[in-house]
From Swiss-Prot:
Residues 522-532 have a biased composition (Low complexity). LRR repeats lie at residues 94-115, 117-138, 139-160, 161-182, 186-206. This is Leucine-rich repeat-containing protein 56. Belongs to the LRRC56 family.
Amino acid sequence: MDLGWDRSRGPRRSTSSVRVRELSWQGLHNPCPQSKGPGSQRDRLGEQLVEEYLSPARLQALARVDDLRLVRTLEMCVDTREGSLGNFGVHLPNLDQLKLNGSHLGSLRDLGTSLGHLQVLWLARCGLADLDGIASLPALKELYASYNNISDLSPLCLLEQLEVLDLEGNSVEDLGQVRYLQLCPRLAMLTLEGNLVCLQPAPGPTNKVPRGYNYRAEVRKLIPQLQVLDEVPAAHTGPPAPPRLSQDWLAVKEAIKKGNGLPPLDCPRGAPIRRLDPELSLPETQSRASRPWPFSLLVRGGPLPEGLLSEDLAPEDNTSSLTHGAGQVLCGNPTKGLRERRHQCQAREPPEQLPQHRPGDPAASTSTPEPDPADSSDFLALAGLRAWREHGVRPLPYRHPESQQEGAVAPWGPRRVPEEQVHQAEPKTPSSPPSLASEPSGTSSQHLVPSPPKHPRPRDSGSSSPRWSTDLQSRGRRLRVLGSWGPGLGDGVAAVPVLRALEVASRLSPRAQGCPGPKPAPDAAARPPRAAELSHPSPVPT
């Protein structure tokens, strides 16, 4: 028994002991861990770690080349919140140009420290707040960082090879920041348009801006080696632009910043992200293992990827401004405002979203009866229109009877002839009376005037309007007056088909009225002529 060991209390204090236990394991005491196969969780974790950065295999797959030394231009749209770029510059030794327009970069330090040979860098609309880390690009000659939130230009003083600098639409508001660019001896082209420094030399209220402030002349003094300023020769220091125009231009620059494809830094993690690459349109809520890598790589001379630019950056939102807050002040009755907004939304609806008539719809077929040419009033207009056009007489405006039921559809609505088309198709009547020609036959020498119907239509208040009957009577009187001018004109105007159609139209058929109708009047041609009908006016001397 070990003297330094007490079974009840464990090892005693102030005593040391060594216990050796013999193992019954016959194999190695420290065996190597065994793998469960290619689809194990460990392998998936390893693949995920490889996808976290731009590995050589990943770059080769994107560039579609086996030798990465052939890649001279790399264009990517990245989001460094999802994954690190790693030290990818080590695998691209001949990379000269790097395009990251529309990406989301927290800092330039995310690019790594292996791009010392890079000469051209595009960083437009990347959400950059500063240029910290740009000192790791000593060979940089051209920097395009427009539409960001850069206000500090001090890191640029370390770029001795810099020749072109584009800072359009940023937040430079102090001429003291422009002074740092004096340390760039080769700087020849500078763009500061869209910055607050164009309106005032220092931050502060606009009412304290020195009178006659000309920022072009001030920048020219600070950077004497400058040749081009805002795409205009730096030697041209003309009068400054009106303040109002410059402020409007600044508003346009801010709108361009907000139109970036990627959300700003303060975007919530659960919100979906719209990327410029169609392969990257997955929401952030998905797992990282199922997300594709947000890169698109181009070799010089290769085609641009499809869908590089977003088509719909700001879709229209029909929700109320009160939902998102920061809306206009609501004054007056809120119910009235909601009704007006509903009308505006309905007015903006495209025609394809409105309900359309379907031929097979049972509801529409039951509510709209089939038209019948025999008992429809439009048959009058279609039957007599040819006779009106042949003789060049302009008819009276055609009116449909008003429907008594609210919301009812006229049975002959689709076949209605517009008055404008009738007037355009008909030749104009001459102002002078037409010449009266002799009748070709004996029967046509007699001027026929229709007699009133023997069985007048019964008065029915629920079937038609009194205005319709008055209209027919006025047409009949007009035909009789025109017919009294002479046999020649009467033969054309008061033709038998037209008068017969007027006589039939003066009463409605049983199907139109919903009740048994009167018997039709005998034909005018079969009826023996009366004495009044055989008389015709005296001929007009020619």
